[in-house]
Amino acid sequence: MSEMQGNKIVVDPITRIEGHLRIEVEVEGGKIKNAWSMSTLFRGLEMILKGRDPRDAQHFTQRACGVCTYVHALASVRAVDNCVGVKIPENATLMRNLTMGAQYMHDHLVHFYHLHALDWVNVANALNADPAKAARLANDLSPRKTTTESLKAVQAKVKALVESGQLGIFTNAYFLGGHPAYVLPAEVDLIATAHYLEALRVQVKAARAMAIFGAKNPHTQFTVVGGCTNYDSLRPERIAEFRKLYKEVREFIEQVYITDLLAVAGFYKNWAGIGKTSNFLTCGEFPTDEYDLNSRYTPQGVIWGNDLSKVDDFNPDLIEEHVKYSWYEGADAHHPYKGVTKPKWTEFHGEDRYSWMKAPRYKGEAFEVGPLASVLVAYAKKHEPTVKAVDLVLKTLGVGPEALFSTLGRTAARGIQCLTAAQEVEVWLDKLEANVKAGKDDLYTDWQYPTESQGVGFVNAPRGMLSHWIVQRGGKIENFQHVVPSTWNLGPRCAERKLSAVEQALIGTPIADPKRPVEILRTVHSYDPCIACGVHVIDPESNQVHKFRIL
């Protein structure tokens, strides 16, 4: 349902089970001129945690989502580790890193193939492909052998699905009936569709690898304040099991994911000029010392104004959360340690408030977090594995570094981050195995609560910088705030009316067909929002409102 009252547009959201997001945009002259990102779900986890034992935090926070899973547990545990001042054993850090590495591999594969691919790949067009020609192309792109027969089998599956009339997840796909924004040759569509199906099996292996150290997936239960508990995973046979699964997934990443990414991107190079933002922030990830952000394998840093010649150090003291345009009491910005979560529902745009998300700002400015931020900082800091991967992508596509600041660059960065993390997993695994063989099997350090203290845990999750902030007194949580990647990227305006990252990125995006705005989905999905989404397009020239589901 929607209505227009003067300049005020109200659109009911379309929601899904993993969360609720609505995007409103105004289109003028075939391009987006204004955008609003609206989260319509209130959870109030911070309120639930007050008065509880800090050790309980991870069990609540990671259940905010079954997709993000481990990252919230790790952020909570790191926050309490920091709060009590415990130094965890090296093996515990390695085990945490290995589980996070497996999460990166799983998360980015699922995103590219199963959450984002349909924005670029026309599955129906795969029926028009020549399987023999497609097989030759696949073999030219990758050292992995692809047969004509295997692609014929995929075509048969797609044909049977189409002829059944029961299209399942493809029912509302924008490519059905043809769409001018889909430009891949039929053979590339067929290859991508085949790998879409194969990735369903591969991602299970990554999830199983996570569960070897994490005890289960989703919602790991091996982290504790002071380290880890999964001593069983130190057995040689368990380490060998992880290594086998890891190698299978890494091979798929190197020989399939990256080649598919480059193949698809080559036909959409115009998207290197769409979806641009200006500021980027990352806390880095995969530490050797949990208390030193500079010890992390992928570096921390801040980039201003798309300037790769300079990277500032990240200063956590400069973070504030704004609520002037959110459904919370007050209008003042607060540092997370002083954060207040008191809901105040109005209506959409009532008192100018339009989202349950707060608006994080760093030094008063909106920042993008996520794979693109991480890759840009690492590239600017001459992080060797990242430089090698980025240069390969730029050379293959025939574009310069400026192309990274875009929807296409954001999607490519996710693959680059997946690749560089996967390559380093073997280093951590070898180190853990060597420690165990040398008789070094400690995973936990004992600790005590101070009378009162505060702490923060930073995790560079697959979707971007995540932080949990805790204040405890007498072993009970007095205040708890979490600042998640989606609030950085998909939050509302701040007190200074500065747009969030996705709101900025959508401005100027061309829309070929307002009734099927796949262009909006491409940019929104490039952030991998961990919430269900509804997209609405308002055309001020016709006063017509269109509702869409993100597929």
Swiss-Prot record:
SUPFAM superfamilies: HydB/Nqo4-like. One of its GO terms (molecular function) is nickel cation binding. Coiled coil: none annotated. Residues 537-551 form a propeptide. Its cofactor is Ni(2+). Binds 1 nickel ion per subunit. Its EC number is 1.12.2.1. Keywords: Metal-binding, Nickel, Oxidoreductase, Periplasm. It catalyses: 2 Fe(III)-[cytochrome c3] + H2 = 2 Fe(II)-[cytochrome c3] + 2 H(+). It is found in: Periplasm. It is an enzyme of class 1 (oxidoreductase). Ni(2+) binds at residues 65, 68, 530, 533. One of its GO terms (cellular component) is periplasmic space. Pfam families: NiFeSe_Hases (PF00374). Belongs to the [NiFe]/[NiFeSe] hydrogenase large subunit family. PANTHER family: HYDROGENASE-2 LARGE CHAIN (PTHR42958), UPTAKE HYDROGENASE LARGE SUBUNIT (PTHR42958:SF2). Perhaps the leader of the small subunit serves as a transport vehicle for both subunits. Heterodimer of a large and a small subunit. This is Periplasmic [NiFe] hydrogenase large subunit. It comes from Megalodesulfovibrio gigas (Desulfovibrio gigas).
